[in-house]
A protein has these predicted regions:
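RNase H-like DDE/DDD metal-dependent nuclease/strand-transfer catalytic core used by mobile genetic elements
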Residues: 1-11, 15-124, 128-129
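C-terminal, beta-rich DNA-binding module of retroviral/retroelements integrases
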Residues: 131-187
Length: 187
């Protein structure tokens, strides 16, 4: 972006159909991440399992490191099971890392954007193009949208376009998963 505007992008992909949704955000604050995640779920549908990295914003806060964070609460309240990969192991998120590279090369490197609003519009347009035209071998050479049409998946969507108001209450049910690395010498 012109002027050196700092931004982050929450990229989400469906591992079965390869559909993707990107949502640029100005900060990594919980409110921004919850809003971006909600926006991607409104476009892609609610996943059964949501694999994410162990970034602090997804599971908690520095102030209360053992408390259940707002993103984790949001997932559980919507019936989504978060699956946290180990810290500092991005290769465990290979699908999203590949999409991040694709997004960087095909959108950011080729498009001159003047402000944050243009970035958001360009990201939504990129997602639409990606989902309707890009072909993957894992989808049998068809676009992500066509892979969805051919699947028997029934999509669930959030109950409204607006994300819930924070702070979220602690859910009484649901489960989440933590993947950890165990060395062969068991240390």
């Amino acid at each position: 972006l012109r002027g050196g505007t700092r931004f982050y992008v929450l990229n989400t992909t469906d591992v079965v159909t390869a559909r993707a949704a990107s949502m640029p955000i100005g900060t990594r604050a919980t409110e921004s991440v919850v809003g971006a995640l909600w926006s991607t779920w409104c476009r892609l549908g609610l996943p059964q399992v949501f694999q994410i990295d162990n970034d602090l914003v997804f599971w908690g806060s520095r102030r209360y490191p053992r408390a259940m964070g707002q993103v984790l609460r949001l997932c559980l309240m919507q019936g989504v099971e978060p699956l946290f990969i180990p810290p500092a192991e991005p290769w465990r998120n290979g699908i999203i890392e590949k999409f991040n590279d694709h997004w960087q090369q095909k959108l950011l490197a080729r498009t001159q954007l003047n402000d944050f609003d243009q970035l958001v519009s360009a990201a939504v347009a990129f997602d639409a193009k990606h989902n309707s035209r890009w072909r993957y071998s894992k989808t049998g050479g068809v676009s992500p949208n066509e892979a969805l049409r051919r699947s028997s998946a029934e999509l669930r969507f959030p109950p409204s376009e607006q994300p819930p108001t924070l702070p979220l209450r602690r859910p009484s049910e649901g489960r989440y998963h933590l993947v950890r690395f165990i060395r062969s010498d068991r240390v």
